[in-house]
Amino acid sequence: MVIVAGIDVSKATLDVSVSEGPVINFENSITGIRRLLKHMERESVTKAVCESTGGYERLVVSKLREATINVQVAHPTRVRAFARACGIEAKTDPLDAQVLSRYGLIFSDSNTARPESEPEREELRQLLSRRRQLMADRVRELNRLDKGLSTSTEKSTRRHLRWLDTEIERVDEEYKKLLKHSASLSDTAELYQTVPGVWPLTAATLIAYLPELGRWDGRVLTSLVGLAPWSRDSGKKRGNRSIRGGRGTVRRALYICAWVVLRIDGDLRDFYQRLRERGKPGKVAVIAVARKLLLQLNAVARRGTPWMKQHRNNCLPYQADPA
């Protein structure tokens, strides 16, 4: 029998409901989580569900997994849609905990939960997140230079830009060092980079944000990343197919790679040209190339062998007959 604890996570507290029962409040701290574990042991909890909150859930998720409790980190949008489907429009922390408990009982982990994060993978994820923050700050400062700043303000902006450039280089060195000194991550990064157009930063992004690569079916992965075109049909109406949702960090990385690969991979360039000749807009064709790249990477990760010439239909590495 599955007994599910729904955990609504905030910065300071954890609201917990077991099997949609009464909600108990714990501190979101080491001490509070110890109390939570004792409570879950008394209630014979076999599974815990919480939402992704941008980082506040990391401590409780890691401690629960250390205690060998199955943890599902659910997408907040899906949980909210589930609550509305159940007729629950109100939103409070205790109510969210009860909704999460019901959600975890109905939905399995197969397509909604990320695999357990290794410490090195989590560190890599945080380094890449910091890099994106610094890059966003750099873009903002560059945009300010076009606003007719006073001399002193312009000097301050340029000083900040120099600091940002130095800090970005430092973070780049850190994540590359992490990849180099981790046997498993290093091998995986080298394997991904055998696919044309995949560079070190892209490989690191895939390792950090798409641990399912090589474990799941290609169709499920394209949907997970947000590269699968969704239908919008009703009756006689046939709406436009469009992508939405998914892991934006991975999707953006593959989109950039797709532009690069069009210059160096003849097969994918021909594929792009065929789509353009059929009247597909340029960005739609590039997204299709990014989807192909993801399938190629999934084949490489699944087989654990470097990328070679591929069969078009199944994206499996072609192995020549031995001489």
Language-model features, listed with the residues they occupy:
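Amphipathic alpha-helical interaction segments
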Residues: V99, S156-R159, W163, T205, ...
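Short alpha-helical scaffolding segments that buttress acidic/His motifs in well-ordered protein cores
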Residues: Y103, L124-R125, L206, A253-A258, ...
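A residue-level signal for conserved active-site and pocket-lining positions in enzyme catalytic cores
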Residues: L100, L134, L254, G279, ...
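Non-catalytic alpha-helical coupling and interface elements of nucleotide-dependent molecular machines
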Residues: R102-D109, V139, G226-W230, W259, ...
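Charged substrate- and nucleic-acid-binding regions of tRNA-handling and nucleotidyl-transfer enzymes
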Residues: E277-H311
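Helix-hairpin-helix/helix-loop-helix acidic hairpins
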Residues: L142, K147-L201, L210, L262-D265
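Phosphate-backbone recognition surface of nucleic-acid-processing proteins
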Residues: F26, P200, T205-R278, G282, ...
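Phosphate- and other anionic-substrate recognition elements at nucleic-acid/protein interfaces
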Residues: M1-R158, R162-D165, R263, V284
